[in-house]
């Protein structure tokens, strides 16, 4: 498995039994043989912080600092994860949950394999901010569970002070989340209020 190196693995369990494992930075080797097409259910308990140094290791630092090559209209920053009381953002690139395929391939940066997975995420949060992730959400007290009907290559998590604009077209809900006080776009959609559902269809 691969996991952010700043996250400390406290135990790896199978059927209630602790398994031996070895940790080498982001690599976790579990001492449990597995046969071809065999299925195992493991519980990996971990805690800690997020190291952003593990993100996009295939991109050279000088490429980020090069201001003479007009790759895009703006410069990229060097922040890839946020964990604070006011804003949280975790993306698959920071390996905030265990994965079986490394997020980068230094030998062939454009040939990165993806492992599509049936993700279910439960977040325990008692604050007043909005919790978002991929999938359909269900709130049960302080727990918010996100379930997905299809396999995904990865999931993200964000918690922030968001406002929401929503529109239902037929049986599909469309939602836009934005930081409170940053609604600079709604006025441009007012002339389309009657025709927007038809445009979406």
What residue ranges belong to the model's regions?
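Extended, low-hydrophobicity, Ser/Thr/Pro/Gly-biased non-transmembrane segments
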Residues: 45-156
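C-terminal beta-strand-rich structural cap/linker in extracellular carbohydrate-active enzymes
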Residues: 36-42, 149-162
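Juxtacatalytic substrate-recognition/specificity segment
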Residues: 121, 167-201
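Short coil-to-beta strand junction motifs in C2/discoidin
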Residues: 2-7, 113-117
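Beta-strand signatures of extracellular beta-sandwich domains
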Residues: 2, 11-13, 120-122
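A surface-exposed beta-strand-loop module
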Residues: 5-66
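Short aromatic-centered micro-motifs
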Residues: 12-13, 131, 167
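A mature extracytoplasmic/lumenal domain signature
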Residues: 2-5, 16-18, 34, 46-48, ...
């Amino acid at each position: 498995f691969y996991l952010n190196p700043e996250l400390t693995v406290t135990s790896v369990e199978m059927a209630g039994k602790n398994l031996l494992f070895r940790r080498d930075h982001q690599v976790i080797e579990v001492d449990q043989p597995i046969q071809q097409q065999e299925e195992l259910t493991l519980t990996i308990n971990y805690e800690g912080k997020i190291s952003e140094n593990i993100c996009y290791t295939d991109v050279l630092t000088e490429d980020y600092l090069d201001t003479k090559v007009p790759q895009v209209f703006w410069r990229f920053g060097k922040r890839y994860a946020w964990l604070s009381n006011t804003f949280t953002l975790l993306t698959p690139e920071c390996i905030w949950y265990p994965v079986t395929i490394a997020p980068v391939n230094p030998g062939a940066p454009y040939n990165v394999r993806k492992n599509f997975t049936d993700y279910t995420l439960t977040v325990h949060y008692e604050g007043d901010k909005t919790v978002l992730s991929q999938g359909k959400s269900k709130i049960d007290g302080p727990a918010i569970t996100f379930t997905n009907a299809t396999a995904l290559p990865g999931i993200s998590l964000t918690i922030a002070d968001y406002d929401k604009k929503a529109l239902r077209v037929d049986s599909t809900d469309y939602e836009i989340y934005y930081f409170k006080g940053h609604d600079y776009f709604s006025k441009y959609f007012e002339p389309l209020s009657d025709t927007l559902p038809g445009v979406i269809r």
